[in-house]
C-alpha cells in the first residue's frame, strides 16, 4: 500500500523567496562516524543559535553499522564491522563506500515544525533523485525508506534502495538519508536491515539494478531534486575549523 505521507503538502518545507540558501558540502575522503556525529551536533547547535546557515553534507563512511533508537540486540547477526549507537530514529543499517550519505541540518522551526512532513519531504527528495535515472522509487505504509519493485525476483518482491533516519534538537534536524549507489551489498547480510525480516524485501543499489551510475552522477541529481523540495542551495563556504571537520 502506498504510504499516505505521499499526500502531505510539501510546499511549506521550502523557505520564502529571498531566504538564505542551504549550504552544500561534499566530502571526498571517507569520514569516520564519530567525527561526523560531532560535526553534525556542533553545526545543528550553531543553526539553532542563529550562528550558521543550514547545511546538507554529502559523504561516505568506512564500513560500519549504526543502530537507531528502535534497534534491537538481535539485529546485528555478525559483528563484521564496528556498531555505533546513533541516536537517530530507526533500527540497524549499514554504511560504507559506494553509499551516498546525506546529512541534512535544517531549521524546521522556520520551515515547518512537523516531523511527519519532514520525513515525507526526505522521501520525495529521494524519489526525485532516483527519477533522474529512470528508477521508480516508492513509499510504503509499513516500511520506512524508499523501495523499488523487483518483478524479476518474483511477485511482490521489493528492494530497499535508500534509508532514512532523522533526529531533531530544538527543531533543527540532523542525520538524514543514505542512497545505495554501489556499496558491497553482502555487508547487509550481517544485519536485519531496518528490522525487516520478510524474505520478499531485500536491499539493492543503482548499480545492482544495472545502471552505470557514479557517486558524482548521484550528487548532481541529489542537488537538483533537493532544490525542488527544500529550495535553493549554495556551495558551502566553511570557516577553517568547520572545514577541518567537514573535509
Curated annotation (Swiss-Prot):
Site (Lowers pKa of active site Cys): 160
Cited InterPro entries: aa-tRNA-synth_II/BPL/LPL, BPL_LPL_catalytic, Octanoyltransferase, Octanoyltransferase_CS
GO molecular function list: lipoyl(octanoyl) transferase activity
Enzyme superclass (EC): transferase
Enzyme Commission numbers on file: 2.3.1.181
Protein location: Cytoplasm
Any one GO cellular component localisation term in the record: cytoplasm
Catalytic activity of the protein: octanoyl-[ACP] + L-lysyl-[protein] = N(6)-octanoyl-L-lysyl-[protein] + holo-[ACP] + H(+)
Pfam families (alphabetical): LplA-B_cat
Family in the record: Belongs to the LipB family.
Function: Catalyzes the transfer of endogenously produced octanoic acid from octanoyl-acyl-carrier-protein onto the lipoyl domains of lipoate-dependent enzymes. Lipoyl-ACP can also act as a substrate although octanoyl-ACP is likely to be the physiological substrate.
PANTHER family, alphabetized: LIPOYLTRANSFERASE 2, MITOCHONDRIAL-RELATED, OCTANOYLTRANSFERASE
Protein name: Octanoyltransferase
Species whose genome carries this gene: Rhodopseudomonas palustris (strain BisB18)
Gene: lipB
Amino acid at each position: 500500500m502506498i504510504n499516505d505521507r505521499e499526500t502531505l503538502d510539501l510546499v511549506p518545507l521550502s523557505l520564502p523567496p529571498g531566504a538564505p540558501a542551504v549550504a552544500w558540502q561534499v566530502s571526498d575522503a571517507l569520514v569516520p562516524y564519530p567525527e561526523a556525529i560531532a560535526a553534525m551536533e556542533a553545526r545543528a547547535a550553531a543553526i539553532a543559535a542563529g550562528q550558521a546557515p543550514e547545511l546538507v553534507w554529502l559523504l561516505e563512511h568506512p564500513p560500519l553499522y549504526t543502530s537507531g533508537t528502535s534497534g534491537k540486540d538481535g539485529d546485528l547477526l555478525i559483528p563484521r564491522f564496528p556498531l555505533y549507537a546513533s541516536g537517530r530514529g530507526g533500527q540497524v543499517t549499514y554504511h560504507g563506500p559506494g553509499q551516498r550519505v546525506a546529512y541534512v541540518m535544517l531549521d524546521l522551526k522556520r520551515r515547518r515544525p512537523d516531523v511527519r512532513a519532514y520525513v515525507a519531504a526526505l522521501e520525495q527528495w529521494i524519489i526525485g533523485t532516483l527519477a533522474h535515472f529512470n528508477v521508480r522509487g516508492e513509499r510504503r505504509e509499513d516500511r520506512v525508506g524508499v523501495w523499488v519493485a523487483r518483478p524479476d525476483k518474483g511477485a511482490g518482491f521489493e528492494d530497499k534502495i535508500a534509508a532514512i533516519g532523522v533526529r531533531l534538537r530544538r527543531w533543527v534536524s540532523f542525520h538524514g538519508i543514505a542512497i545505495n549507489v554501489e556499496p558491497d551489498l553482502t555487508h547487509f547480510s550481517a544485519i536485519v536491515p531496518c528490522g525487516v525480516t520478510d524474505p520478499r524485501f531485500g536491499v539493492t543499489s543503482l548499480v545492482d539494478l544495472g545502471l552505470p551510475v557514479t557517486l558524482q552522477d548521484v550528487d548532481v541529481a541529489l542537488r537538483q531534486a533537493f532544490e525542488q523540495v527544500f529550495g535553493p542551495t549554495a556551495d558551502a563556504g566553511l570557516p577553517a575549523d568547520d572545514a577541518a571537520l567537514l573535509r
